Amino acid sequence: MKDTFVEKVDDFVRQHDVLKERSTIVVGVSGGPDSLALLYYLLEKRAAKQFEIVVAHVDHMFRGDESHEDLQFVQDLCKGLGVICETIRINVSQYQKQYGMNAQVAARECRYAFLERIMKKYDARYVALGHHGDDQVETILMRLVRGSTPKGYAGIAVKRPFHNGYLIRPLLGVTKEEIVNYCNELKIIPRIDPSNKKEVYTRNRLRKYVLPHLKEENPQVHEKFQKFSMQMQEDEAYLQELAFEKMNKVITKKSDKQISLSIPAFESMSMPLQRRGIQLILNYLYEYKIPSSLSSIHIDKVIEFFKRTQPSGSLDFPGDLKIVRAYEECSFGFKQEIVSPFLQDLSVPGTITLSNGDKLVTEVSEDIPSDMNETVFVAKYNDISYPIRIRSRENGDRMSIQGMNGTKKIKAIFIEAKVPREKREEWPVVCDASGNIIWLPLLKRSAFAISKETAKKDKYMIIHYKSKESSGRIMK
């Protein structure tokens, strides 16, 4: 066991490959004992390790004059130490109201944005923060009590990617008591944030009532929690890699704002990979800015949603994310504007582009296409009244079906084809000038259509559905 604070931190830094020599380090300094201990430790190592050190301080303006005094304290300290000091005052309460988030999340976003800016300014390799071993214990306990993701249960990372470098926490191997003793040895008088003692916060209650009992059982309990954290992170990295590999085979469509997957393929994955697969989707869509109100409960909800017997339904998640199930497919995407009813004339010959980028193209010919698949409609030219009209569906729509007697509801056709509800509003309905529905592209042709078998030499009106995707099934 190392005897001194500096030796213990040295050992931890070496063990976890936290810092490289000849690096620029941005140190987050609040003025409290943790960040001051970190700063003085790095200053002690500066000459031997050839570190360049820049201090960064954020006044969140939560405590009025008191927090402004913290800023002045850090500035004066850095001036005396001959260290570069970058400070900023941010009205976090205003930011919090503007973006609808809790105070702690808002403060963290503002603080990290500032740290990233300073990191860029000085081309720094590291941002160093003063979290210690007791913080690690409290964080893991808090997430176990509240619920979290597997990654969350691993607690605070010693080192993780941040901007073009790393965010590091060299003090995770020491306790709060050791930090305070180190400050006392150096005769450092830190600033104390009174909010750290308010029992309204879960972390503070765990610190006051739970942590002391754990330390009675084992004074080095923080080392056990740190070992647990590292094992969890290693296991999580492996499982994340597996989940990523599996999800690439499960996802059927992907864009910046939407992901669709096959439910049967997803459910063939093991449960640990299912949970991580959902987390990967959420990370991608939220661009890693997960709303604070989102938790492991939401991931469980998605998995339960897939197991329901109802073939369709939806879930609403924070930040206007909507999860829509349609039979064996599920899409995750941000709510879009309601599709407005549309009506457009299509000349013959002519072309129109649909809202999804697909096209309807008409032509007149005495020959019918060799491939009469679902993307083609052919009728005798003189059997159709013009102009051709392309519109959105309407209540009560019915059409005659090629090869059948009577008519059938468009709604029933959509249901039988398992067309998702949100797709039905933008699906093109092709009519003639008399209002007859002559074609529902990709789904059904009307009695006006001719087949390859019944075709004779004649003048034909032909409509092609041309998808922007090669499959020809973009609507589906």
From Swiss-Prot:
Its EC number is 6.3.4.19. Ligates lysine onto the cytidine present at position 34 of the AUA codon-specific tRNA(Ile) that contains the anticodon CAU, in an ATP-dependent manner. Cytidine is converted to lysidine, thus changing the amino acid specificity of the tRNA from methionine to isoleucine. GO terms for molecular function: ATP binding; tRNA(Ile)-lysidine synthase activity. The N-terminal region contains the highly conserved SGGXDS motif, predicted to be a P-loop motif involved in ATP binding. Pfam families: ATP_bind_3, TilS, TilS_C. InterPro entries: Lysidine-tRNA-synth_C, Rossmann-like_a/b/a_fold, TilS/TtcA_N, tRNA_Ile_lys_synt, tRNA_Ile_lys_synt_N, tRNA_Ile_lys_synt_subst-bd. The gene is tilS. It is found in: Cytoplasm. The keyword ATP-binding applies. It is an enzyme of class 6 (ligase). Belongs to the tRNA(Ile)-lysidine synthase family. This is tRNA(Ile)-lysidine synthase. GO terms for cellular component: cytoplasm. GO terms for biological process: tRNA modification. ATP binds at S30, G31, G32, P33, D34, S35. It catalyses: cytidine(34) in tRNA(Ile2) + L-lysine + ATP = lysidine(34) in tRNA(Ile2) + AMP + diphosphate + H(+). It comes from the Bacteria. CDD domains: TilS_N (cd01992). Keywords: ATP-binding, Cytoplasm, Ligase, Nucleotide-binding, tRNA processing. It comes from Bacillus thuringiensis subsp. konkukian (strain 97-27). SMART domains: TilS_C.
